[in-house]
Design a protein with these regions (language model features):
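Short aromatic-glycine-(Arg/Gly/Cys) micro-motifs in beta-strand/loop hairpins
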Residues: 16-32
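Short N-terminal "domain-start" leader segments
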Residues: 1-21
Length: 70
């Protein structure tokens, strides 16, 4: 089941990407401003655990070498 995490001013939506590997869209004001693309299932699970723990994504790397700024 894909998840959505609500944060102050934005949401993070998990989406299918490559078989069991998922991406995470960062959506602010109805627009996707960044997409986190984990490099492995382990990284995906770490991302989910961090989001489940309440972490925000500002300052995270998107998996493509870019820093996410909210």
């Amino acid at each position: 089941m894909l998840k959505t995490w609500e944060r102050d001013g934005y949401t993070v939506e998990e989406k299918h990407f490559d078989y069991d590997l998922h991406q995470f869209d960062i959506i602010k004001d109805g627009e996707t401003i960044a997409t986190i693309t984990p490099g492995s299932i382990e990284e995906m699970e770490e991302t989910i655990a961090a989001l489940d723990a309440g972490e925000g994504v500002d300052g995270w790397e998107d998996g493509m070498g870019n820093t996410i700024r909210i």
